[in-house]
Amino acid sequence: MQIAVYKPKHKVRIVTAAALFDGHDASINIMRRIIQSTGVEVIHLGHDRSVEEVVNTAIQEDVNAICLTSYQGGHNEYFKYMYDLLKERGASHIKIFGGGGGVILPSEIKELMDYGIARIYSPDDGRELGLQGMINDLVKQSDFAIGDTLNGEVKTLQNKNAKDIARVISSAENFPEVAKEALEIIHKKNKNSKTPVLGITGTGGAGKSSLVDELVRRFLTDFPKKTIGIISVDPSKRKTGGALLGDRIRMNAINNSRVYMRSLATRQSNLALSKYVHEAIQVLKAAQYDLIILETSGIGQSDTEIIEHSDVSLYVMTPEFGAATQLEKIDMLDFADLVAINKFDKRGSLDALRDVKKQYMRNNNLWDIHQDDLPVYGTIASQFNDPGMNTLYKAVMDKLVEKASADLKSTFTISNEMSEKIFVIPPSRTRYLSEISENNRAYDKSANLQVEVAQKLYGIYKTIESVLNVTASELKQSFLDTYGLNSDEILKHVQDDNKNFIKLLIAEFDRVKLNLDPYNWEVITNWGETVNKYKNPIYSFKVRDQEIKIETHSESLSHLQIPKVALPKYQAWGDILKWCLQENVPGEFPFTSGLYPFKRTGEDPARMFAGEGGPERTNRRFHYVSAGLPAKRLSTAFDSVTLYGNDPDLRPDIYGKIGNAGVSICCLDDAKKLYSGFNLADVMTSVSLTINGPAPMLLGFFMNAAIDQQCEIYIKENGLEKEVEAKMAKIFKDQERPKYNGGLPQGNNGLGLMLLGVTGDQVLPVDVYLDIKTKTIAQVRGTVQADILKEDQAQNTCIFSTEFALRLMGDVQEYFINNNVRNFYSVSISGYHI
């Protein structure tokens, strides 16, 4: 049965987000879509949002409710802290809703709702109510008036109290009659206001929000004491009345006490601005912000509404506007003070820049101005410190001073560089993966053709065998030893009436064999030798100039000899060649079964997985799970605080997640404690680091922990303990010395704990330390996950831009190559997360 959609009686606004250090955004994305379709204006923040950021947003946006998902633990502290912070800031009317699947226990749900959380939805609620039913309940509880009364907020606007500013805007938007008197007072106050308004408009998807964020970041740096207000407008849905106010998800610089942002829905069709924009601007002027930015929703070619509300207007577009004649239809090119061609990394950007400049020149009759001096700029807002954005920012500030007499004289320094995408993968190599797949398909096609040739040769061979008076082994020897057919030798065994026939077959064999690659003929001729290698009791091969001998068979409980590598019993050359070209034995091309002929013996592939609490607790767990086993295969899970590259803290929304579902590691000493008692340079020890975003940093901790372990061994072997202790006592003269908390677990000999708080280069001669370092990093075994593409697509712990993160991956691998790090892998592809 279809559940009826609840229709709210008031204009309901809700903030949606996923909790701090939580990348599970699939659920909240589904929920906010249903909330929006229920007629609600949704301010969506995305994933990994702190309590302070959510609360600041809720107050600035004057919302009815906050809706959160939390799947990463720490929910008790997170929700309670949010409730307390809202209460502390006088916003306890904002209701809090949450969910986390089975992560939040029924007892915890009761505890949180008793504390004051409006509702935590459980899987049982989902089964009972359905998705729409849950959203109906949420919206119904949030359906109350905002701004129906004012209590003197207008008198304190100049204090820039976000709650007061937001309430006056809400009153003007929701109850114009209630706000009428307050707005009259504001208009009188603003008669002499010199606060400039920068209007930013453009087509949908042009990157306006990212561009605004970059302008704000530069403004805050350029003017350390000035403030900025932002009004961002998004369209309302005509069908439902709901709206997605999603500009904040692109804003990284606005969580600052000097920035106020308010998102507005148009609440009308076919217009890019809300009819209450003027009132919102007046409120921000009364609050005495130094600059106001007004960003519209996406506009069409004929929309110029922005110029009525702004002192300076900026039109944002992309290079993909179609034919140059389309520019003649864009009204904003007649009125805009500045034009930004964003996403300037797109193909054809330079041509677009030229065409837009020409059109701008024609529209404004600027025939005497050189094209380079026209206010048209190429920008890449998504790229950090983009030169085009720097130039645009300076031009905007200069225009505000010129047109609005604003006290915003910029000291921002710019270069004459043009925006140019800094590519991790050069454009000429963007088809790299396609080329690999094309090459693989071409290889498969070639292999199949070669298989057909080999099979035809085998058919000719069997035909000759059937008419000769020789055994198959004699004929085969004749074929293979002579690398072809020895006609004279074979014809000795042929009756006179068959000689011409055999000559024809031999000639055909030689002709067909011309189409067979010599390498493939060698594969066929060596097949018998390959089979014998795996029949012999011992298989010998070399790895890095070291000869390794492996038993080819293992003995079963029934005392049967079971081959470790079983070869197919093919006879036909086509079958043999196809198997060798597409599968083959381990250690041979195409390496489908690994790089080496056999796996290392004496090291069972047991995964000793651990990660909980602090480093000492997980260290004890590692020693417990590896006790009595010759090989130590330590696999490390990190908590969400570490996964997002943050330090642990007493702040409740962080504190609740420390050591939850993984170990908390934030410094080198933590890594030393975590792996203490395990010789990380031992050939029987390997470590897996399940970390991605901050992988290079955690890898650095691990490598330095391993190096300092070997420094400790060197110190003890050379009797340098007293000398080193004296140096460390001097270093820690006026501070507490770090230590391993609690007693050492069984099996932990304390290796790695001597140099807590220092590194080997502080207590050993430089040449000794560098020698130990070089040897250690070449010996350590293991892997770090560092699969950034998977994070970008699924897990959401890519804490840097994807391009920068990929560059880091490349830099790490380059270091490994240059320093002979061959036993530790710099990346482990784990696409199963996707």
Language model segments and positions:
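Catalytic alpha/beta active-site cores
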Residues: 72-74, 102, 528, 532-834
